[in-house]
Amino acid sequence: MLKCFEIQPDCGAVGPVLRWPAGTLQEAGCGLQPDGYPIRHGRGDPSFSVKALKRYQLVDYVSGACLMMRRTDFLEIGGFDPIYSPAYYEDTDLCMRLRGMGKAICLTSRAECYHIENATSHGVESAEWATRQSEKNRLIFMGKWDKILK
């Protein structure tokens, strides 16, 4: 992931391919639909080939589950916006703000992270809570980014 900053000088953030604990593909970077819902590249698609991706692939955002960025950029944009606390869309908003600075968001297809999706929220409440929180924060996100996404 660190090499991406050397190869892609305008890189603002980089993330790895995310896999479920069993090794199946969770996502290879994300796109955004005009309504703010994510497009998790490769998710649920057995024909999707991570090997076919470029080593450093441009994406709309990478998951905060494993995200690397320069400390100076993080401080300059004010870090994660607390309006999204405790979870969901804080990483998406962070990447959008980096993109607004002219920075690229990259997936590095040669790095992998095993991720238990929603593990934190499941421990706090339930899947219903995670869904409600995600939708609440999607609406906040759209209030901020609607014009750009459309």
Task: Show the residue positions of the predicted features.
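Short glycine/proline- and charge-enriched loop/turn segments
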Residues: L32-Q33, V50-L53, G78, A119-E128
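Short, flexible, basic/aromatic active-site loop/helix in glycosyltransferases
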Residues: P16, Q33-D60
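Conserved acidic
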Residues: E6, E90, K150
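A short, conserved alpha-helix in the catalytic core of glycosyltransferases
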Residues: M1-L2, A52-K54, L58-G78, I83-E112
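Active-site-adjacent helix/loop segment of glycosyltransferases
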Residues: R19-A22, M96-K150
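Conserved donor NDP-sugar-binding/catalytic core segment of glycosyltransferases
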Residues: M1-D35
